[in-house]
Amino acid sequence: VITNAKIGNLAVDTIKIANRAVTSQTSTVVSSFRNTYVNGVGWVTQTVATLTFTGVAGDQVIIGFSVKQLYPGGSDRDAYAYLVLNNSVIGTIAARDGSYVSGSIVRAAGTLTGSNTVKVLAGGDNTYADLTDTSLFVFEAFK
C-alpha cells in the first residue's frame, strides 16, 4: 500500500511493507533562506523541513531527502544540508568551496522509535538555499 501526501512543498511517500505500517504527518517546508555567518558563533543551521510519523520501535527505516540547490556564500565557503532522524544525523548533502549543488538526493537508514521526527537542517557561511523542490521521503520500514 502506497499513499501519497503533499503539504506545501513537502512531498511524503509512505510505504507499508510486510505489515510494518508507517503513518505520516507533515509540517510545511520553507522555500528558501539566506544564512549569514555570525561572528564569534560561526554558522548556524535552520530547520527547513520536518516530518513526524509513528512506527514500530526497533524497526529499520530508509529515509531520503533532496534539496533543489545549495549555494555557499563565496569561494572559500561551504554549505550543508543534514538529514536528522530522532536527533541523529544519518545523511548529508554538501556544497563545498563555493561550488553549488543542484538536485542532490540522499537515502539513509536509521532505527525507529514509536514516535519519530525527521528533519532537514541546512546552513553554512552566507548560504542561500533554494528549497522549492525539497522532498522528504519515508521509503520503507522493515523488521
What are these regions (language model features)?
Residues 22-143:
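Extracellular jelly-roll beta-sandwich "head" domains, especially the C-terminal globular C1q domain
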Residues 1-30, 34:
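Fibrous stalk/shaft segments of extracellular and virion attachment machinery
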